[in-house]
Amino acid sequence: MTEIKVPDLEQKALALLQADADKIYKLIDVQMENLTMPQCPLYEEVLDTQMFGLSREVEYAVRLGLISDDIGREIMGSLERKLAHLHELFNQR
């Protein structure tokens, strides 16, 4: 049986969380392109659901010791900043 080293798991967890954050950004970007107003209930529900799911993933990885709390906050904060910027761009149209 192959033993998995902890740093490998840490890197994999970080990569998976970042990939999920990128998927959320792309999903919201596509929704924004197809909406006439960002206050659409469907848009808000999708955003809230996706962000909640990612926050649970991050918390789980932190609790397992795969990532630090600071890295988890950075993943969430970075995505929130990107989405806020996307929202600003949409409102400038």
UniProtKB/Swiss-Prot annotation:
Cysteine disulfide links: none
Origin species: Brevibacillus brevis (strain 47 / JCM 6285 / NBRC 100599)
Family listed: Belongs to the UPF0358 family.
Protein's name in the database: UPF0358 protein BBR47_22520
InterPro entries for this protein: UPF0358, UPF0358_sf
HAMAP family, per the entry: UPF0358
